[in-house]
A protein has these predicted regions:
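Noncatalytic alpha-helical scaffold of FAD-dependent oxidoreductases
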Residues: 1-187
Length: 187
């Protein structure tokens, strides 16, 4: 049966069944939530690294533009790339600080009063920096980078079956992603 499933997917889960005394359940779930917050922040920091690598390339993809202004692609990109790199560096610094100080910030990270958000902290500002048809390929690649990095995100899932008293702790992973497997092992 496993061989038949593996022909159709490269995904599987690392599974652990744990008996948690009911009075300790909240402590256990908070511990798992902290692990998930740390894993999420690490994934978002990997996104910052991937975006920095992209914007550090010597050439970036550009779409159609009006050459009548006489401004070269390099001139049009130079300032925008510097703004993008500064934005990403600032967000990376913020998120790194949250990861470093996860213990005292746990309550705010858990209730989302502190929220590491690709959409609001990176994507929206990049859309402002790279506005216009000529820069659509740049934004398209940023979204593709986000999807690739997000695909490797590791998290820990919990569920219980009625009556067995076990907490089933699962870490879904893709078997073709070595870094994801290592992150799951570390979690």
């Amino acid at each position: 049966k496993t061989a038949a499933i593996s022909r159709h997917t490269n995904a599987f889960k690392i599974n652990e069944d744990v008996v948690i005394p009911l009075p300790r359940m909240a402590e256990y779930t908070d511990g798992i939530e902290r692990i998930n917050i740390e894993l999420s922040l690490r994934n978002k920091l990997a996104l910052c690294e991937a975006l920095t690598d992209f914007f550090s390339q010597s050439t970036l993809p550009l779409g159609r533009h009006d050459d009548a202004a006489g401004i070269s692609s390099a001139e049009r990109l130079e300032d925008r790339v510097a703004q993008a790199l500064a934005l990403i560096d600032g967000v990376r610094t913020l998120w790194s600080g949250w990861l470093r100080d996860v213990e005292p910030l746990f309550a705010q990270l858990q209730d989302h009063s502190l929220r590491a958000s690709w959409k609001t902290q990176i994507r929206q500002p990049l859309q402002q920096i790279f506005s216009g048809v000529a820069f659509e390929p740049v934004l398209k690649e940023c979204n593709a980078i986000h999807q690739r990095v997000l695909k490797g995100r590791v998290w820990v899932a919990l569920h219980m079956h009625a009556g067995d008293g076990n907490v089933h702790t699962n870490i879904p992973v893709n078997s073709d992603d070595y870094e994801m497997l290592q992150a799951a092992h570390g979690a």
